[in-house]
Regions:
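M16 family metallopeptidases and their MPP-like homologs
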Residues: 12-19, 46-99, 104-153, 170-179
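Active/ligand-binding-proximal structured segments within catalytic/core domains
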Residues: 14, 24-36, 46
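Short, charged, low-complexity patches
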Residues: 25-29, 33, 41, 83-87
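Short, conserved catalytic/metal-binding micro-motifs enriched in Asp/Glu and His
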Residues: 30, 159, 174
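Short beta-alpha junctions and helix-cap segments that line functional grooves
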Residues: 31, 60, 162-163
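Low-complexity, intrinsically disordered Gly/Pro/Thr-rich segments
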Residues: 156-164
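Extracellular/periplasmic catalytic domains that process cell-envelope and extracellular macromolecules
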Residues: 166-168
Length: 181
């Protein structure tokens, strides 16, 4: 789908269907997006921004609650890079997630980052209250204490298998924003 907007730039968004927040795969999807785009050493930043210089910015993130969610990939191609070229490069990186296992070092780095973010987030009482309210909504307030363990339990094999199920054209909706001339 193509949309035009008067902001003078080009933008690409892909959305893949994924599980809801209470499904065990939710943690796998979250780790996948962290591997792809969380930090300067993430795959998208290293390959698509720094090495190939195809994007000025690119991100992968999940949205989901009690309903089924989406795994989003959004990016702004460098001027002169076509949307088709940008899309092809993203699919190539997603294909690697399906075919090449994540290294233990890369997986441990993402797990450590998540755990440290949780520790720092729990310093703020508002964050704790918000998270506790969400888990109370699900009927399992005590699950708030299990989050880090659920992320720590994610394996490279789960990441590869979930990527293989998720990153297929039939599971993807694509939106291109084109600048109005």
């Amino acid at each position: 789908y193509y949309a035009s907007r008067g902001l003078g730039d080009v933008y690409k968004r892909q959305a893949f269907h994924m599980s809801n927040r209470m499904h065990p795969d939710y943690y796998v999807y979250d780790m996948i997006t962290d591997i792809l785009s969380n930090g300067r050493s993430s795959r998208f930043i290293q390959s698509l921004v720094q090495e190939q210089k195809l994007f000025t910015s690119i991100d992968a993130y999940i949205s989901g609650s009690l309903d089924e969610g989406l795994l989003h990939v959004t990016g702004k191609p460098v001027e002169g890079v076509s949307l088709e070229q940008a899309e092809k490069a993203i699919w190539k990186e997603l294909e690697k997630m399906k075919t090449v296992p994540v290294s233990e070092q890369e997986l441990e780095k993402v797990k450590n980052r998540y755990e440290s973010e949780q520790i720092f987030n729990n310093i703020n009482y508002l964050n704790v209250a918000t998270n506790l309210a969400f888990f109370e909504l699900t009927g399992k307030a005590e699950d708030i204490n299990e989050e880090v363990g659920k992320y720590r339990a994610v394996t490279a094999e789960q990441i590869q298998a979930t990527s293989a199920r998720c990153f297929v054209p039939e599971n993807c909706s694509i939106l291109y924003y084109k600048a109005i001339s």
